[in-house]
């Protein structure tokens, strides 16, 4: 469960960071 969650976060967080900071 945790490795899956970590993988999901690693894929999801950069997209949020990109939207917030406008840096992609």
Swiss-Prot record:
Cellular component aspect of the GO annotation: extracellular region
Record has Translocase as a keyword: no
Top-level taxon in the UniProt lineage: Eukaryota
Alphabetically ordered keywords of this record: Antibiotic, Antimicrobial, Secreted
Single Gene Ontology BP annotation: defense response to Gram-negative bacterium
Keyword Amino-acid biosynthesis: no
Subcellular location: Secreted
Tissue: Expressed by the skin glands.
Primary subcellular site in the record, as a coarse category: secreted
Family according to the record: Belongs to the frog skin active peptide (FSAP) family. Brevinin subfamily.
Function statement: Antimicrobial peptide active against the Gram-positive bacterium S.aureus (MIC=12.5 uM) and against the Gram-negative bacteria E.coli (MIC=25 uM).
Annotated protein name in UniProt: Brevinin-1GRa
Lineage of origin: Eukaryota, Metazoa, Chordata, Craniata, Vertebrata
